[in-house]
Amino acid sequence: MQRAGSSGARGECDISGTGRLRLEQAARLGGRAVHTSPTGGLGARQVAGMSAKERPKGKVIKDSVTLLPCFYFVELPILASSVVSLYFLELTDVFKPVHSGFSCYDRSLSMPYIEPTQEAIPFLMLLSLAFAGPAITIMVGEGILYCCLSKRRNGAGLEPNINAGGCNFNSFLRRAVRFVGVHVVGLCSTALITDIIQLATGYQAPYFLTVCKPMYTSLEGSCKENSYIVEEICSGSDLTVINNGKKSFPSQHATLAAFAAVYVSMYFNSTLTDSSKLLKPLLVFTFIICGIICGLTRITQYKNHPVDVYCGFLIGGGIALYLGLYAVGNFLPSEDSMLQHRDALRSLTDLNQDPSRVLSAKNGSSGDGIAHTEGILNRNHRDASSLTNLKRANADVEIITPRSPMGKESMVTFSNTLPRANTPSVEDPVRRNASIHASMDSARSKQLLTQWKSKNESRKMSLQVMDSEPEGQSPPRSIEMRSSSEPSRVGVNGDHHVPGNQYLKIQPGTVPGCNNSMPAGPRVSIQSRPGSSQLVHIPEETQENISTSPKSSSARAKWLKAAEKTVACNRGNNQPRIMQVIAMSKQQGVLQSSPKNAEGSTVTCTGSIRYKTLTDHEPSGIVRVEAHPENNRPIIQIPSSTEGEGSGSWKWKAPEKSSLRQTYELNDLNRDSESCESLKDSFGSGDRKRKHIDSNEHHHHGITTIRVTPVEGSEIGSETLSVSSSRDSTLRRKGNIILIPERSNSPENTRNIFYKGTSPTRPYKD
């Protein structure tokens, strides 16, 4: 079959039935339903090529049943009735304005009358300009827009064609008719509204008395007696001019000019792009200024009062604004308006499923970041899962994972200030530290530390050393207490990011010689800043979930018993609580009793290295202690100073041969060191009850963590150090109390870490 086409196929509507719709349908069907044109035909290849050329333009055709009926039976009758009504109101005297009174010899109504032919903008010129000017501008703009959009690939941006009654209406025809039609109807409506208001008010124009020529002699009384005249006393010959003189409010010129200017300005703002920065403002200002001039000429030529013109501007602009927004949809394509409405009403689930709104992560940087994050989660599954157990809104806890595998069973007990970690550990050996930050009230922390410091100073803690061995002392070391304005952050690889801040240096005492010299001293890092939260490090010595097996229960009971036994060291020494914890955790010898105090309770701690207590500085923030007992078991004991060294400095005493080097760093927990084996004391049950009550209290304070890291070890001579002090001099720290008893290295060992903090308002007990 021969394919055919004609000029009728390219027209908007073809009476012979060879319209574009059928041609495009035939092209979509592969050229099967093709008709013959009466004017001749084209070859099959030519028609196939033409249809393929038109197909990429993608002109979607929609069938409409209500388009033509609405246009013929609704819109055209409204427009026709408006025009007819406007004709009778403007050009005939069928409808006359109401009669309103005036004052005798009113100078505001006695202005000269200017003939219509001498007006700057006559009424017919106004109608032609108000109708033709915007209409022509809109049609030209729509033609240019249609040509530009039709050249795009697949006709993007064009409205779909409408097939109604066998006629195909493209976007240019539809938009031009819609915009121009609304403009014409709007002008007619504005003129009708203005005429109705003028007829209803009957307000006189400034030239009314000039054309009326009132006969004051026909009045029953003089103008002095009747200053306000309501009778009809005009003697002018031209009734049309007299009636027009009674229709001043609002100004017809002002309303029509304002409507045309605002309507076409809205069209320019919505249609023109921003490629030309000055074209749109130029066109908008041109039409606005023209409308303003049309209204002001009515004032200068005494046709209307100023208030009439101003009210006319408001009425015309309001009508144009309403029609532009609601009748033509702000001159936007109908499909775009529908899409915008659907986007606004689309649910969040639809937006999440929309592939156009999903960010692609296929580039290198984002892919690396995602892979890195997934690797972190896989390597430290325990830390990620433990975050789900944080119930506090501002909880941001830093968890330091151990660097070496710990015992078979572990048990971590926290106070009510921090959540429990009840998740198993799936940790890669490469994984070092995971950081989570816990915010605290810095003001409250400073208050507690100040109270602790004042209490500590009031007791005038004195350090007494029972063993006097002056030989083999090593050079003094310094303890640096750092007060930071920003909390320290521990990265994934264990690196610390700490900004520079101020230092508080404390000169310690000397270290007696032992098998190894100890040139390096402890480093206490305390970070705080007024008005900022403190960083709390919570070490986790566990790699397994906290089990409720009988073995764990028995282990916990044993460590609770060991904790009660440590009252001897705590009551026998006038030392800070933190140093008592270190001494208890590092002890390995059996305590020997000797009558030292009035109560008969004695404490003897056996070890290879002797230490003096820490200074009075409040241990707020972060505390780290690192010791490295690779082969031997050093014991940390804090004796009291008897040689006038109660200044609160560190002194390290060890056996004569100086070969051991140990470093104590704050903020890491004891990794490989051995634990205290046994403690002997003679304290009564009353003290144990008090200790038990203290251990059951819940406190709201930060937690100080200690990590003892071995560096190098050698032979350490074991010596005995006896420490005693008054029972009333026991210091109850206002800060954080940490009890860390450690068991031996046996496979069945169990470590219990008890974190205790005193209540913020709890007083110190003697």
Swiss-Prot record:
Specifically expressed in neurons (at protein level). Its main location: membrane. Residues 454-503, 510-529, 634-654, 672-705, 741-766 are annotated as: Disordered. It is a multi-pass membrane protein. This is Phospholipid phosphatase-related protein type 4. Pfam families: PAP2 (PF01569). The modification Phosphoserine is found at S37, S347, S386, S439, S462, S474, S608.
